[in-house]
Amino acid sequence: MAAVRPARPSSGHPETVLRRRVRMGGEVSAIRLRFLGCGDAFGSGGRMHTCFHVSAPKGQFLIDCGASALIAMRRFGVEPNAIDAILVTHLHGDHFGGIPFVILDAQFVSKRTRPLLIAGPSGIKRAVSGAMEMMFPGSSRVQQRFAIDIVELVPERSQAFKAGVVIAYEVEHPAGEVRLALRTECDGKVIAYSGDTGWTPALVSAAREADLFIAEAYFFNKRLRDHLDFETLRTHLGELSPRRWIVTHMSADMLERLPALGCDYAEDGKVVML
């Protein structure tokens, strides 16, 4: 597997960089996001693990790649070889555990030849290699027929990839050294994702005025340090000011309340056009 390298910094405050690109973009093409999986770690509601597929004019990428990601790609007709990058928020299995399956499929089934970028928090190379060895001993040492570039995202620095730009923000969740929220910009459209986290001011920077903010709402009103609940999220929406927001990563407690809440929520297979 390729050597890990840090993300390269860019000039200017990260939020300013993205806003400037949005304003200068003029007419933009449609961005399509499909929820391949929107469930929690425990399969609440029979939902797949977290994985969002984004199709943009310049490329396709995944935001998180939970353990069931490859199954979901097959189910919803997403071609694995078309994926240019996988962006990872944190190193829990329901958010990155599908990467070994994607790599093995690329090597032995889909016969991938195009390079693949994997970008995530510090320690991601070690985590991916360790997961591969745990599930398929020896697999991390196989010479791939395609290049894998593993990048550590540095909080509050922008990282370019084929489809656009991503900026990571450190959030609160017990998952290794660094846990991230992600703000991506593709062709003038901003998609922000909270990852798993309790409330933190970093979410304001990550989600402010995003075209789409995908936010964890694990519980309805039970407050935890490391998971966001719906009531807390709703309280802070004025600070975030997203153009659209969708809740995801819901426990059974939250799923049972959805019909009465009147909010926009993720479902496996749901498509959002931007």
Q: Residue ranges of each PLM-predicted region?
A:
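Compositionally biased, low-complexity segments
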Residues: P6-A7, G25
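Binuclear metal-dependent hydrolase catalytic cores
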Residues: H13-A192, S205, P259-L274
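Glycine- and other small-residue-rich loops at beta-strand/loop junctions that grip anionic moieties
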Residues: P121, G195, T248
